[in-house]
């Protein structure tokens, strides 16, 4: 599960392009927190710190304790604007967390896909879902969903009903869907059929 980051922020009362440029000259980044029916709060963050955290894996699904003027808020990153050349963070949108659960889009990691049974037989591992939307307990937001696919044979599909999700998480959609398949390359079917014919002749 994700660790909870601790961030310090300052309130800001000046807005617009000029104010944002002035902040960046001071080594700070403009940001805003909104959602949950609350009045938005405009803040600034230390540029080096927020850029460092942004470059960590799965920053968008990262639960953050944000302290502003000695008051603490639980927030999630919603959107990040980057400098087009340097990839330094230029602006961040956060959302307030008030409910006990939160919809999250998290990456899927297919562990062992290069050595899956079906791949060893000449199949191709076809990823259909690289990210999935989950409903998560805000205290147990995963960095990703890791699925072991080493035993997946050729000509099969991995369905959502077969996936064991992290504790406190469920798929938002109740309808079953396919995350990945292993499809046969040209010649694989012929090879399998040949093996089946040999096996039949030996019986």
Swiss-Prot record:
**Record's protein name:** Large ribosomal subunit protein bL25
Q: One Gene Ontology cellular component annotation?
A: cytosolic large ribosomal subunit
What does this protein's UniProt record list under function? This is one of the proteins that binds to the 5S RNA in the ribosome where it forms part of the central protuberance.
Family statement? Belongs to the bacterial ribosomal protein bL25 family. CTC subfamily.
Q: Name one GO biological process term.
A: translation
Return one GO MF term.
5S rRNA binding
Q: Which HAMAP family does the annotation name?
A: Ribosomal_bL25, Ribosomal_bL25_CTC
Organism of origin is Rickettsia typhi (strain ATCC VR-144 / Wilmington)
Q: Which domain of life is it from?
A: Bacteria
Give the record's keywords alphabetically: Ribonucleoprotein, Ribosomal protein, RNA-binding, rRNA-binding
Q: Assembly and partners?
A: Part of the 50S ribosomal subunit; part of the 5S rRNA/L5/L18/L25 subcomplex. Contacts the 5S rRNA. Binds to the 5S rRNA independently of L5 and L18.
PANTHER family attached here? RIBOSOMAL PROTEIN L25/GLN-TRNA SYNTHETASE, ANTI-CODON-BINDING DOMAIN-CONTAINING PROTEIN, RIBOSOMAL PROTEIN L25_GLN-TRNA SYNTHETASE, ANTI-CODON-BINDING DOMAIN-CONTAINING PROTEIN
Task: Quote the InterPro entries the UniProt record gives.
Answer: Rbsml_bL25/Gln-tRNA_synth_N, Ribosomal_bL25/Gln-tRNA_synth, Ribosomal_bL25_b-dom, Ribosomal_bL25_C, Ribosomal_bL25_long, Ribosomal_bL25_short, Ribosomal_L25_dom, Ribosomal_uL5_bac-type
- Gene transcribed to yield this protein: rplY
């Amino acid at each position: 599960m994700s660790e909870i980051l601790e961030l310090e922020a300052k309130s800001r009362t000046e807005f617009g392009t000029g104010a944002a440029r002035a902040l960046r000259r001071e080594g700070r980044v403009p940001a805003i927190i909104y959602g949950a029916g609350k009045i938005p709060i405009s803040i600034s963050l230390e540029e080096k710190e927020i850029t460092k955290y942004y470059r960590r894996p799965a920053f968008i699904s990262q639960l953050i304790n944000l302290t502003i003027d000695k008051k603490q808020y639980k927030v999630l990153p919603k959107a990040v604007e980057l400098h087009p050349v340097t990839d330094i963070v230029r602006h961040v949108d956060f959302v307030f967390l008030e409910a006990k659960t939160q919809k999250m889009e998290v990456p899927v990691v297919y562990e062992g896909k290069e050595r899956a049974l079906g791949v060893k037989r000449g199949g191709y591992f076809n990823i259909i879902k690289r990210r999935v939307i989950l409903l998560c307990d805000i205290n147990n937001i995963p960095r990703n969903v890791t699925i072991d696919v080493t035993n997946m044979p050729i000509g099969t599909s991995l369905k959502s009903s077969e996936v064991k999700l992290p504790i406190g998480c469920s798929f938002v959609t109740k309808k079953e869907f396919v995350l990945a398949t292993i499809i046969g390359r040209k010649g694989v079917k012929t090879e399998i059929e040949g093996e089946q014919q040999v096996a039949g002749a030996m019986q």
